[in-house]
Swiss-Prot record:
The keyword Glycosyltransferase applies. It is an enzyme of class 2 (transferase). InterPro entries: Ppnp, RmlC-like_jellyroll, RmlC_Cupin_sf. This is Pyrimidine/purine nucleoside phosphorylase. Pfam families: Ppnp.
Amino acid sequence: MSMLQQVSVAKKANVYFNGKVISRSVVLADGSKQTFGVVLPGEYEFSTAQGEIMQVISGKFDVLLPGKTEWVAYAEASQFELAPNVSFSIRTDQISEYCCQYI
């Protein structure tokens, strides 16, 4: 199990889509921010305010990246990068976890 050291964790969860996507914000010792979340089965559209690297921690996601028309499968331990100010969609048929690193 990969562990983070010397972090601050927000007490309150970020809850989206009526509780079907829930994440926690973490601030690392260097001041950078990440969120760790759980996604229940379904399809969801998100928007970015800044660049992001999304890593699949467990489960799998199909992702419709900005400007694309075909879904791309991302399995556990894979990742994809998003530019600032874009929208993208995620769908999954199982409980899945992710880490979002802001860049």
